[in-house]
């Protein structure tokens, strides 16, 4: 019998964690992890390329195994957990959504930049038609004022989303900023609210707890912190903390501890740490994809890549605007040269 839950956790190690293993998951690994998560009574397990359905590419990183095989394998071993997928319109297509629904995925999480919810309308609509639980995923949530976030969440709600997430893609939000956003959504949006954190400033756990305090009932976690950058909120730790707080997750804590230690840890190429790189991404509030570009141009111009990333963050440059990195760096180099002449 399913345990009562106050908060519904989605485990993202098999999607966000794909970044940490360079998208090299095998069917055997996915089966092992998904089966253990199912036995621990985790309600949702997200499986896909790190950048969502159809993300396998030279630009985003090639998958070792076709994600459809991974999704099918996860579905086959889960008796109670539902398999979720992430789809970014423009990368994943309506056809991709239909395929995974046919394989048995039960939840679709449709992700857009925080100011671009309008591009999710068709995909949310299709997911609902396919009978999938449907989530709106507003990424880079630190880049929009609270009023804009509310407006965009209401759009996703109007398209049929069952829940809307505040997604801290860059791990840049501070606890009071999470509080303001979740509180506003709870006041103005009629569906469930969720939070997806990244640990680049070591705040994923604190931010998740603040979100729950403000009424979020959907929280993302990643076992052993396996995710992009410094990883996500560590699921087994989150379950323990929520248990101490009297918040019911319905998840077996000891089984989560064991699968983290015995199954996931040996698969990691390196422990998830807050490195200089992930820290600067959280500090600057920019996409991780900017890092290598900034490094290359900084080397050519004799600059510190961190200065470029911080300036890009100030200008609120978003994913897809990688060409701006060169423009901003050249402009900064010119200013520096002028100041030396003076």
Curated annotation (Swiss-Prot):
Keywords: Aromatic hydrocarbons catabolism, Lyase, Manganese, Metal-binding, Plasmid. Belongs to the 4-hydroxy-2-oxovalerate aldolase family. The active site is at residue 19. It catalyses: (S)-4-hydroxy-2-oxopentanoate = acetaldehyde + pyruvate. Pfam families: DmpG_comm, HMGL-like. The record marks 15 as: Transition state stabilizer. Gene3D superfamilies: 1.10.8.60, Aldolase class I. It is an enzyme of class 4 (lyase). One of its GO terms (biological process) is L-leucine biosynthetic process. Mn(2+) binds at residues 16, 196, 198. This is 4-hydroxy-2-oxovalerate aldolase. Its EC number is 4.1.3.39. Substrate binds at residues 15-16, 169, 196, 287. GO terms for molecular function: 2-isopropylmalate synthase activity; 4-hydroxy-2-oxovalerate aldolase activity; manganese ion binding. Residues 7-257 form the Pyruvate carboxyltransferase domain. NCBIfam families: 4OH_2_O_val_ald (TIGR03217), PRK08195.1 (NF006049). The keyword Lyase applies.
